[in-house]
Design a protein with these regions (language model features):
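Short, intrinsically disordered, mixed-charge
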Residues: 9, 41-44, 110, 114, ...
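Basic-flanked hydrophobic alpha-helices used for secretion and membrane insertion
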Residues: 104-107, 117-174
């Protein structure tokens, strides 16, 4: 009623799509470059991004926390204002050494006490589809490093992490 909700919506407007396409059946859509090209020709379409968004669990130094991972292309960072929202570290999804890197929300980073150190990987965990029980040992894990910390608003800061699209694909294929 005092306009604060408008300020919150504006703060995440560049990373929240105006149009989202979901599959009619199932959870996934195969990326079709010809279809994406056709969609891109529609008047008013500025950018098209394939995003894998899934709930996962992260593990760091013995702490475990659920988050929402957004697997995005490197172009996503340049075409949104994500790099302007970085409050620590950098805005990249692959380290200069070629390692997987993540950009974490401020709340996630603070809660997990994440560090910019190569010797302390962050484990991105997703249920192994071949496992027959629910436990930490039944999770597929990908090691990643902290590249940066962003701050949009409390809701996003407390639950979202960005990773390379290929990391999202690898997690889901486990």
């Amino acid at each position: 009623f005092n306009g604060i909700d408008s300020v919150i919506k504006m703060s995440e407007a560049s990373v929240t799509p105006a149009v989202t396409i979901y599959p009619q059946n199932g959870r996934f859509i195969e990326r079709d470059s010809l279809l994406l090209e056709k969609i891109g020709e529609i008047e008013g379409i500025n950018h098209i991004h394939s995003v894998i968004q899934e709930p996962i669990v992260i593990k760091f130094k013995g702490s475990i926390r659920p988050v929402v991972i957004k697997g995005v292309s490197p172009h996503y960072i340049q075409q949104t204002d994500l790099q302007d929202k970085i409050v620590g570290g950098g805005a990249y999804l692959t380290s200069p050494e070629g390692e997987d890197a993540i950009i974490a929300g401020y709340g996630v980073a603070a809660d997990m006490d994440l560090e910019f150190r190569r010797d302390n990987p962050i484990l991105l965990c997703y249920p192994d589809k071949n496992a027959n029980r629910a436990s930490l040992s039944a999770l597929s894990k990908i090691e990643s490093r902290l590249a940066g910390i962003f701050s949009y608003n409390q809701e996003m800061d407390n639950k979202v992490m960005y990773a390379d699209y290929k990391v999202g694909e690898r997690l889901l294929k486990c």
